[in-house]
């Protein structure tokens, strides 16, 4: 499972349960209280963060998440309100 899949799964759970849910991003893992994803060695999360999904499944808290490896930076642009996500890959200089 990847970040995008866990993001969408958390979004679906919040919509199905009609309850707010949090996706917690920490140095070594990402979790939503039901599922947990280990961040592989060699990938760094820019900072510990929490994404809150409202009961309609929309992201109501955070605009971007950034991961980096030795070779590239992967940034996720999270659109507030509608819960859409866009992946942007950039080579490191």
Locations of the language-model features?
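N-terminal helix-rich module
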Residues: 5, 12-93
